[in-house]
A protein has these predicted regions:
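Hydrophobic transmembrane alpha-helices and their helix-loop junctions in integral membrane proteins
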Residues: 1-209
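Cytoplasmic/organellar membrane-interface segments at the starts of transmembrane helices
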Residues: 145-149, 204-269
Length: 269
């Protein structure tokens, strides 16, 4: 914020494109660029000497909280997910602004962690729309009974973004918190806690409606979405859990994040 308005507007794109925009390609290139500028163009010493990291930290913190609050106001499911993306990108920026090795590691890890969780949620939103023709949260009453696998994956993705263990979102946020304490900063930890609660706040009503509110009679004619949609959803949801339990499995996320962080702070030594 305040350069975010294009991102919620981009959610009108088809679901695969939305997932690509919000979870993998476009937005992540921006935050990775910030990491490169902080680490290599300015360097941690210059960032600290001129208090540039403090300015960046304030911007990231405000964006995290404000984007979460704006997500509460969105009835359109994909639009709520879009504001969630705005907030979670700022976790990555916050990691860079901490200019501590563990903070930077946590921010870099959140690039990958957010990708699996947010792809899961956007795929779920797409499956709901294709299968039930519903896109507003207020219309999702009782859908877990007809789409149990889709909503189960949605719960996993939501819990991960809220930072609930043992999902990968908890791991990256844990390193962000430890990195904050490493630098003697408590306010970023407070921001992480508050934003985690806000994440629960704007995801829980969706889950509550789906599982505990009675749906309309029109749901009786529907079943679970096509396996061509459900299988990718379950794969990304399971990856969110697996990479939470084993961050270095397959792609060595923690090892790569630590290596990049060490390169920035130690010049590759």
């Amino acid at each position: 914020m305040p350069l975010h308005p294009w991102l919620p507007g981009a959610m009108v794109a088809p679901t695969p494109v939305s997932a690509l925009l919000h979870a993998v390609a476009v937005v992540k290139s921006g935050v990775f660029g910030i990491i490169r500028v902080v680490g290599y163009v300015f360097g941690s010493d210059a960032m600290a000497d001129y208090s540039l990291n403090d300015i960046l930290m304030v911007i990231a913190g405000i964006t995290i909280i404000c984007a979460s609050l704006l997500a509460f106001r969105q009835d359109n499911l994909k639009r709520r997910l879009a504001y969630s993306t705005v907030g979670h990108l700022s976790y990555i920026v916050l990691g860079a602004a901490l200019i501590t090795p563990l903070g930077m590691t946590g921010g870099i890890m959140h690039i990958a962690a957010h990708a699996t969780m947010k792809i899961t949620l956007f795929f779920c939103a797409g499956a709901i729309y294709v299968n039930l023709h519903k896109e507003n949260i207020s219309d999702l009453n009782g859908i877990a009974k007809v789409m149990p696998w889709t909503m189960g994956a949605f719960v996993i993705g939501s819990m991960g973004l809220a930072g609930i263990p043992p999902l990968n979102g908890f791991v990256s946020k844990w390193y962000l918190a430890i990195g904050s304490l490493e630098g003697g900063m408590l306010i970023p930890v407070l921001i992480l806690v508050i934003s985690g609660l806000l994440n629960v706040g704007y995801f829980f009503p969706i889950i509550w409606r789906a599982y505990f509110k009675k749906g309309g009679p029109e749901l009786e004619k529907y079943g679970e979405a096509s396996p061509f949609m459900v299988v990718p959803i379950m794969v990304t949801a399971i990856l969110s859990l697996v990479f939470g339990l084993f961050p270095d499995l397959f792609f060595h996320f923690f090892e790569l994040a630590s290596a990049i962080s060490n390169t920035i702070f130690n010049g590759g030594t």
